Amino acid sequence: MAVFRFAGLIFRRPKIQSAFLLWIYAMLYVFVRDMWDVLRLRYRSPETYLYSPLVMVAVLLLLGVVNAASMSPLFGSGAAAVCLSVILVMVKWLVLSRSMRKVLHYYGAPRLPLWGFILVSEALLLPLLLVLYVPALAAFALLWQAWVFVVQVRGLMWMGNATVGRVLVGYVLYGIGMLCVGTVILMLFIAAGWLDMETLNQNLQALTSARQ
C-alpha cells in the first residue's frame, strides 16, 4: 500500500504527468510510424521493433475489440465475448510469432524476435472497425485484409531470408496451434458458464442459413 501511495504522490506532480504523457505520445508515434512503413513494404531488422509493454497491451486490447465486433454474430456482445476475443487475439499474436520463429529457424534463419513485427503488422487490421459503422466498406475491407496478409508474408520472407513456401509452412503450423489452443479456451469459457453452448449452436445455425 505504501508503494501505491508513493506512486500516487509522484504522479500528482504536473511535471511528472507531462513527462509521462510525452513518453506515451513518443512511443505511440514510433509505433504508428512503423505501421506506416510496414504498410509500404519498408522493413527493418526484427530486433528494432521494440515497444513499451503499455503500448503493446493497448494495441492488443484494441485488436481484441475489433475481433469482438467481427465475432459478435456468433459469440454475442457480452463481457464474456469481449474477454474471449481479447484473449484469442493475444494467443494469436503469441502463437504466430512463435510458429514463424521456429519454422524460419528450422530453415536456417537465426532465432528472430518477431513479437514486435507481428504486432505492428496485425495492428494494420485496426481500420476494419470502420466497417461496423460504414457497411458499404465491406468489399474494401476484404482487399485491406488481403494486403495486410501480403505485407506480413513479405516481411517474414525478408527477415528470415525465406521463400514464400517456407513462410506458408509457418502459417500452417500457426493454424494448427491456434485451432488447438483456441478450442481449449472456448471449452473453458463454456465449462465456466460464461458462454452458453446452446446459444452458440443457434447463432452458428443462423449464420449458416444466412449464407446459403
PLM features: residue spans?
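N-terminal amphipathic/basic-hydrophobic helices that include classical n-h-c signal peptides
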Residues: 1-26
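Selected alpha-helical membrane-embedding segments in polytopic membrane proteins
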Residues: 23-115
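Membrane-interfacial segments
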Residues: 43, 74, 78, 103-108, ...
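Hydrophobic alpha-helical transmembrane segments in multi-pass membrane proteins
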Residues: 59-64, 125-129, 178-183
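Short hydrophobic alpha-helical membrane-embedded segments
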Residues: 60, 115-123, 143-148
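Transmembrane alpha-helical segments of multi-pass membrane proteins
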Residues: 87-92, 96, 111-131, 172-177
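Membrane-interface helix caps and helix-loop-helix hairpins in membrane proteins
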Residues: 130-139
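Terminal transmembrane helical module of multi-pass membrane proteins
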Residues: 139-212
